[in-house]
Amino acid sequence: MMELLSPAGGFDSLIAAVQTGADAVYMGFGAFNARRSAKNFTDEEFASAVSYCHLRGVRVFLTLNTLLTDRELAQAADALKKACAMGVDAILVQDWGLLTLAREIVPDVPLHASTQMSLFTLGGANEAA
């Protein structure tokens, strides 16, 4: 089955994606997503966006797709927990440390390898899976 996954850098683009048939949207909030130049979402806006999407049968993927330092890992984990409490359907991850941590703290939330994860071999893909 083919799925249309669209970016949502702010509420206007989220509404446009949903109204034009997106099956799912990916969006970030906070500092740990590769779309930092986009408007992105405050915590309150993110929660509203998740509700808006779910009421319309659209899934929401959180982008946590940047490389992290050891000092940033705890903050990124907090963002992950907060977004999962808001009802995100999946997480797009780049950093291997966050991938490992996410498997521990939100084991039931699907994780997706970001295109920035730099997986080039079958072995790397198997390790990420």
Predicted regions and their residues:
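Non-catalytic helical/linker scaffolds that mediate oligomerization, partner binding
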Residues: 1-129
